[in-house]
Amino acid sequence: MTDINMNDCKMRGWMGLALWGALAAAPAGASTDLAQKNACMSCHAVAKKLVGPSYNDVAKKYAGQKDAAASLAKSIKSGGAGKWGPVPMPSQPGLSEADALALANWVLAGAK
């Protein structure tokens, strides 16, 4: 049997938690910047409808759907019309697949 040092276990636990927190927080800030950089905020807001639906409404629509992030990322990248009213969403050909997925995950997580 090995001797387990409880202080060592606690320290590793706290270090892991701190690392997880730092990693979890990074994409949110990055996605906010990404949304601003790609002019998403010109038509969308977190909690209210502008030209397009609010991010909260989008998250509600996709809630519980299998592959919601991939589906939303595809819509972000290719644009479309008729899902949210008469104003079409333009395609985003300059947006990478990874950035579209990051934006989709950010929206689905409450755009925080």
Predicted segments, located by residue:
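Sec-dependent signal peptide recognition
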Residues: 10-20
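Sequence/structural segment immediately N-terminal to covalent heme-attachment motifs in c-type
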Residues: 29-46
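Short, solvent-exposed mixed-charge patches
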Residues: 111-112
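Axial heme c-ligation environment in periplasmic c-type cytochrome domains
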Residues: 42, 51-62, 74-104
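N-terminal secretory signal peptides that target proteins for export/translocation
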Residues: 1-12
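N-terminal signal peptide c-region/cleavage motif recognized by signal peptidases
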Residues: 23-27
